[in-house]
Amino acid sequence: MKKYIFLFFAVCAFSVYANAQNRTGDCTSYTSDDRSVTFYLNDSSAIQLRLCSQSTVRIWFSPDGSFQRSNPSFAVVNEDLEDVGTVHVDEQNACYEIFTPKLRIRVNKSPFNLQIFDKYQKLLFSDYADKGHISNGQRKLEYKTLRRDEHFFGLGEKTGKLDRRGEAYKMWNSDKPCYSAVEDPLYKSIPFFMSSYRYGIFLDNTYKTEFKFGTESRDYYSFEAPGGEMIYYFIFGKDYKEIMKQYVDLTGKPIMPPKWALGFAQCRGLLTSEKLSYEIAEGYRKRGIPCDVIYQDIGWTQYLQDFEWRKGNYENPKKMLADLKDMGFKVVVSQDPVISQANKRQWEEADRLGYLVKDSTNGRSYDMPWPWGGNCGVVDFTLPAVADWWGAYQQKPIDDGIAGFWTDMGEPAWSNEEQTERLVMKHHLGMHDEIHNVYGLTWDKVVKEQFEKRNPNRRVFQMTRAAFAGLQRYTFGWTGDCGNGDDVTQGWGQMANQIPVLLSAGLGIIPFTTCDITGYCGDIEDYPAMAELYTRWIQMGAFNPLSRIHHEGNVAVEPWLFGEEAEKNAKAAIELKYRLLPYIYTYAREAHETGLPL
């Protein structure tokens, strides 16, 4: 008999537990304080609504009701967007209501169910049935009602169609060279999307979040986080532009590029020598093809990342930079966020100072395999003391005459979601599962702020591969190592894939961006066969806000290599961009002020 009684109570307990995982609790009370209202549920959870403005609401689901987070937001710089006065809650039998001049917010009590209407009482956004807010250990999930005619856009650089409905996406900065037209995740994580029902959602969580737009049911969409806090912002606007502008108010304005950055640029994977830099510069000027920027890729340094010119490749780098400047070229060099162990002096210095990310299993500096230069230490940019130390090193080539940086491999490189061994990395501000997606952002912040600190009255040029929401405050973007395929047919498809990726980047508030024109990897050396495709790459690239020709290795992709017809057409496309430059620069200023894409 005792056995059956035990089984009865065990089944009841499991039922209660299972119900707690699959149903949002009932609201039993609330408290209010200035802008915020906190609703308490009978399962010990709580949900806080904070009015950031008349049309923006921060929603915080706390399963234990503590409302504690390990770090301040990496993305949000200002959430009190306007004076909203003291929030007034109207309590009714079945619900609570909060009104602003633009929104009606309704909280149904049993179960807790959040609904947001516009001022004309049109339902914009709603929790789904009785499971709007669910927790399962550290995992937190939000389920929202999906309308038959609702469509979604955003999430930053993502492949595939612009409409996200019917698709699922992950946020985990990943190194995906030659990525396909359906690859996900990629290099940047921008957990911000917009609905055709005139609202946007920004999920302010840095872990590997997931978004499912009707893939599990045609009745709901969902977003979830495996760790951290479930904090997201509901942003209402009359159109997408207004929604994006308010997101920019939350996360900061884009930096304004120098005018030359909007011209054309030339690079290749092994453009890492004085001799080749002169040859390319002279090739452009001899043929009268406009070009403003020459890049130097990863091999320009003696070691990663000592910022010293590679001996043998550069005889007199200061003179080279001065000569190229006289020819009308700016030079941008790459930097990586690591210190090669072969770079003994700098690595030992960083290790001694505690400036490298630690291995939590042994307390030592983490031993990171790297695509170039052997194993490395990973610089911990979340540690405040690192900023000036790194800034002093990166100032060396600036003093020599370079114009800016491209911050490469900040995922960190070779990262993807299957490589869980890297999760043992411990940063100053937390374990790697929390910091991974913002690692590149913390690096870009240091690069930008140190550049401005040491070079006042100069506009920073920085272009990054890996970042998180808010990157626009520090850097420009490019879409990473896109491909050109293994043959001409694949190349056309890969080029076409870059169009929605670039458009989606703009919707994710990366207004200043480019792809690797010609595709970073893939076969393009059969120049006659590739001539037409190359021409189309250049023509498409001319309408990138930033325009950079780039390919892997020592594969030359200058316009004059693809035949007379291709050179003529490429030159015409590039000249068209320069004729449009007054308009481009005007819209660049607007993008700087508003965040809207060019």
Where are these regions (language model features)?
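Glycan-recognition and catalytic regions of carbohydrate-active enzymes
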Residues: 174, 559-598
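Detector for glycine-centered tight turns/loop "hinges" at secondary-structure junctions
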Residues: 44, 120-122, 166, 361-365, ...
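N-terminal accessory segment at the very beginning of proteins
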Residues: 19-260, 267-269, 273-282, 293, ...
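Generic alpha-helical structural element
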Residues: 181, 232-236, 266-273, 379, ...
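C-terminal substrate/ligand-recognition segments
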Residues: 267-269, 277-278, 283-286, 549, ...
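Acidic (Asp/Glu)-rich catalytic clusters
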Residues: 255, 285-288, 504
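Bacterial Sec-dependent N-terminal signal peptides
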Residues: 1-24
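Aromatic- and carboxylate-enriched substrate-binding clefts and catalytic-loop regions
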Residues: 73-75, 290-570
